[in-house]
């Protein structure tokens, strides 16, 4: 059953081939036997209660397509009464007193939450090695990273531990692990899904999204996650369409842009070949391919890491050992409490970004770093606007390589390069997807789809049509 999509599980539940309780027990058994370390918290008792409620709803004929579907929730979304750690020692004992808007919407649809997934601490990382709860393993090769920061969510879907999972994408944290684990990942337009109740890393970048087996599943889940929320000041009052309506539209005449900057040195040859084979598949469906340019995307890494680190420095200042979270037992006075609690509670990468952000915001450096980075951010956004006057969608790689070995990248700057193709999308606030398009070195390769603002329907349509013609999204890791 772990290979089934949302649509297939819905049919099975509707036909009474199995119950929600049986389905939930099946997934919980797989989680308990798994060696992926994909979960921080397994909510088995809660899941079985939710499954029984879903069974009762189905019996009364009041079920939707999502009723009783088991999912994994990234441990950055607040869940009332359930530990919400953000992968950090700082929040290891934090029990959220309220639900994030996304959590609330999923609960209202009578979905079954199997647990909270492992992640890079406060979503800062590209390998899921920065977690206080140890690294997640890639289901395709246990010696490889799953990607980050939503590595636990990606591994849970690829490894058959959940039907789908939630994620967040600040600089590629849905698309990159989706690519490295061979699943479908969607990061919507900034403001499309409420950020209320998501533990903040960089507020002008953070965006909730979805990790699924198929584009059709992603459309189904986006239907209930998207929408305006008065609790989130960055939430957009943009009408939410039915994202499943246009999935079967023809791609005849679709204009695809390939940014020349995405295919320079540094991109693995096998990865590039897989990307181009996928593009040729789209051409066979009637699409037209054009070379385009995003000249300022080469500045995406320094621009992102300056702005995001500044926002991180501000957001994480609330974690001081006083109100909630980790509190040092060795402190002698209030100042010492602040210093020791944060030094002991935060991991090395988080402390590095806090220091970078604090430095960039300090007197004498604000204009030289933060203000300049914001100006470059605008130039990057303008590049995309110009390109979208000529094309319908931009395509390219998600990651320059396939998944690398656990523990093999020690240099932070080298790690930051893993996000070279995804960061510009977050800087511009655009929607993006990753869909599986092949393998290199026996590891999955993802194709990145980048759309104009609010074009999630188009991206899902493009991905769905590709998945009707290919079977890369149906491939399953041998050990799973």
Swiss-Prot record:
Entries under InterPro entries matching the protein: Amidase (IPR000120), Amidase_CS (IPR020556), Amidase_dom (IPR023631), AS_sf (IPR036928), GatA (IPR004412)
PROSITE patterns on file: AMIDASES (PS00571)
Keywords annotated in UniProt: ATP-binding, Ligase, Nucleotide-binding, Protein biosynthesis
GO-annotated molecular function: ATP binding; glutaminyl-tRNA synthase (glutamine-hydrolyzing) activity
Pfam families, sorted: Amidase
Catalytic activity: L-glutamyl-tRNA(Gln) + L-glutamine + ATP + H2O = L-glutaminyl-tRNA(Gln) + L-glutamate + ADP + phosphate + H(+)
One cellular component term from this protein's GO annotations in UniProt: glutamyl-tRNA(Gln) amidotransferase complex
Record's keyword annotation contains Cytoplasm: no
E.C. code: 6.3.5.7
Coiled coil ranges: none
Active site: 74, 149, 173
A single GO BP: translation
PANTHER family cross-referenced by the UniProt entry: GLUTAMYL-TRNA(GLN) AMIDOTRANSFERASE SUBUNIT A, TRANSAMIDASE
Similarity field: Belongs to the amidase family. GatA subfamily.
Known partners and oligomeric status: Heterotrimer of A, B and C subunits.
Function: Allows the formation of correctly charged Gln-tRNA(Gln) through the transamidation of misacylated Glu-tRNA(Gln) in organisms which lack glutaminyl-tRNA synthetase. The reaction takes place in the presence of glutamine and ATP through an activated gamma-phospho-Glu-tRNA(Gln).
Protein name in UniProt: Glutamyl-tRNA(Gln) amidotransferase subunit A
Organism for this UniProt entry: Vesicomyosocius okutanii subsp. Calyptogena okutanii (strain HA)
Gene responsible for this protein: gatA
